């Protein structure tokens, strides 16, 4: 139907590429939505991946109580669609909410988190990045598959921790 002029009252009328010409040349809302989508994508995808990888590397250690901490980091992914989380975000992002109260402690004025289109996109990106738990679990399961003998051999060869991360862990 994209090649037709169509509504529910009349039969479709073939218009060729006219709809696409209008979309790409005259429709400002289309280009605005593309810009917002690109901004959202370029913020959330790297943000979520980097945060999930960092947390997975930290949680890959065999420490006492680490399973509890892993669970705590995964919970936001499970709760993402609940009403309780919606209320929590509302409390956090209100003009006199928790985050603005913390900003006030360091003498930063209140931020209107949803008051402008740019801040709304950033706020929505933060909400998406907050759900990094599923990505973290995937990274953590992959990290658990790396044989410890590779790290032992690298230590014997004198490799530094950053070198082991970039040559063994990350690949």
Give the residues covered by each predicted segment:
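A structural signal for multi-pass alpha-helical bundles of membrane permease subunits
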Residues: 1-171
């Amino acid at each position: 139907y994209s090649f037709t002029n169509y509504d529910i009252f009349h039969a479709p009328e073939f218009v060729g590429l006219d709809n696409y010409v209008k979309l790409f040349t005259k429709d400002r809302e289309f280009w605005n939505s593309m810009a917002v989508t690109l901004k959202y994508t370029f913020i959330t995808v790297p943000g979520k991946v980097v945060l999930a990888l960092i947390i997975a590397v930290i949680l890959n250690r065999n420490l006492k109580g680490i399973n509890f901490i892993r669970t705590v980091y995964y919970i936001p992914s499970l709760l993402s669609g609940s009403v309780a989380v919606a209320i929590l975000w509302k409390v956090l992002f209100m003009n006199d909410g928790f985050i603005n109260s913390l900003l006030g402690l360091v003498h930063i004025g209140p931020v209107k988190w949803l008051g402008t289109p740019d801040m709304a996109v950033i706020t929505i990106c933060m909400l998406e990045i907050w759900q990094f738990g599923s990505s973290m679990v995937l990274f953590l399961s992959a990290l658990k598959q790396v044989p410890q003998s590779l790290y032992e051999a690298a230590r014997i060869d004198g490799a530094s921790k950053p070198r082991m991360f970039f040559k063994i862990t990350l690949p």
